[in-house]
Amino acid sequence: MNPNFLDFEQPIADLQAKIEELRLVGNDNSLNIGDEISRLQDKSKTLTESIFGNLTSWQIARMARHPRRPYTLDYIENIFTEFDELHGDRHFSDDAAIVGGIARLDNQPVMIIGHQKGREVREKVRRNFGMPRPEGYRKACRLMEMAERFKMPILTFIDTPGAYPGIDAEERNQSEAIAWNLRVMARLKTPIIATVIGEGGSGGALAIGVCDQLNMLQYSTYAVISPEGCASILWKTAEKAPDAAEAMGITADRLKGLGIVDKVIAEPLGGAHRDPVAAAALIREELSSQLAMLKAFDNDALLARRYDRLMSYGL
């Protein structure tokens, strides 16, 4: 099984393997097999459109966790210029599961904050698999208050299974760190745009998710608990995760229908990992447009709009 493809994508993987084999044959024997390659490429595109046009909620949850999916630093590289990363919470340490710093978007200074997972084993461990400890959220809070002080918009990228539940995190008051961020973000006198780029897991996501505009990528998720966690509570087995995912309404389209999400950003065919540069361009377009819209509000109007937005949840 090709690790770059999930199990429901294997028919696509098989076609891609055939295309690569034909390319190698053509290179070795100088044969003109372009027509056959074009036919298989068209077939692969049609098959991909068919599969991705009918994804279940559980399949979308798995897409949100795809090991090749672009992470925050990938989007920073492809969307912004002059990124200068800032470190530390000034209380305990620097948490690598949260990255943040100042950059430019359309030549405007902005503060970027996001979860960061890892690719290889060592980086995954260093980033704690994208699960922040309290010092990560306190670093984020420090950067957000800095952004308000220097009148910079805040752009957050959400991609976490959740806040780290370890004993050391609890000893340093994980719940307080999350709650404090919610309080601070609700009152910040600067525009905040949050974009869910992968997993939006519970309070770990919400701690950098209070905003004026919430975006979700097409194959991202946002929920109070993982489907496996929900299934383990309700049915006492994680095998019911597909049923839980469907019942919870974790997908971008479902949340858009509920009024939680403002904008669903389309992904390239097959997911953002198939064309990270194109995915970044789509996000950049939305961020530029939304920033221009939010800059039209003065501070009082911006805070009133944010408050009304939060109070509308669940109505």
Swiss-Prot record:
Instruction: Please state the protein's primary subcellular location.
Output: cytoplasm
Ranges for domain CoA carboxyltransferase C-terminal come to 40-293
Top-level taxon of the source organism: Bacteria
Q: Where in the cell is it found?
A: Cytoplasm
What this chain does, per the entry, is described as:
Component of the acetyl coenzyme A carboxylase (ACC) complex. First, biotin carboxylase catalyzes the carboxylation of biotin on its carrier protein (BCCP) and then the CO(2) group is transferred by the carboxyltransferase to acetyl-CoA to form malonyl-CoA.
Family under the similarity heading: Belongs to the AccA family.
Q: Could you tell me which NCBIfam families the record lists for this protein?
A: accA, AccA_sub, PRK05724.1
What name goes with this protein?
Acetyl-coenzyme A carboxylase carboxyl transferase subunit alpha
Organism this protein belongs to: Pseudomonas syringae pv. tomato (strain ATCC BAA-871 / DC3000)
Query: What gene name does this entry carry?
Result: accA
